[in-house]
Amino acid sequence: MLANLFRSASAILFLSALLTGCGFQLKGSAQGSDPSLIGQSIRLISDEPRNELTAAIGQQLKLAGAILNEPEAATLVLRLGAEQFQQRNLSLTAQARSAEVELTMSTHISLNRADDALIPKSEASVVRQFLNDPQNVVGKTEELRLLREEMYVDLASQIIRRIGHSLNN
């Protein structure tokens, strides 16, 4: 029994060392974040300062090591436009009801350092599809809510990656 425990522990230790050695990192982990954001002083200005996307971006900036400041102290200014959410039917059932829906979440962003536009005004967007089950209204509503939350996080991650890339160039 002790030998089996030792083998199991050795196997787990070997696999974790192998994954670490090959450079594997979880997506979005703090250790895997872009080092160019660490210590950057950023002012976040949003057309919708209290919405979920602004909160998600602020949270991810902090996790990446950025410091959110007032305009006087910030060296970078990140501007977010209004969030736009659209639904589009991809396919219909025989009863002319929506069978598959495409969801698009987007916003306009820009990043400036003094008078230099690091990211000129551009659109960031994420697109998802989901199957619309007309028989399961409660489940569909919950799935849509979870999908929107996931889209907020994905869009915020995309914006953070763009910021990191612009700071490295």
Where are these regions (language model features)?
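A structural "domain/chain start" motif
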Residues: L2-R7, T20-G58, A64, L167-N169
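Sec/Tat-exported extracytoplasmic proteins
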Residues: L61-G65, L111-D115, P134, Q158-L167
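Short acidic low-complexity segments
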Residues: A66-L76
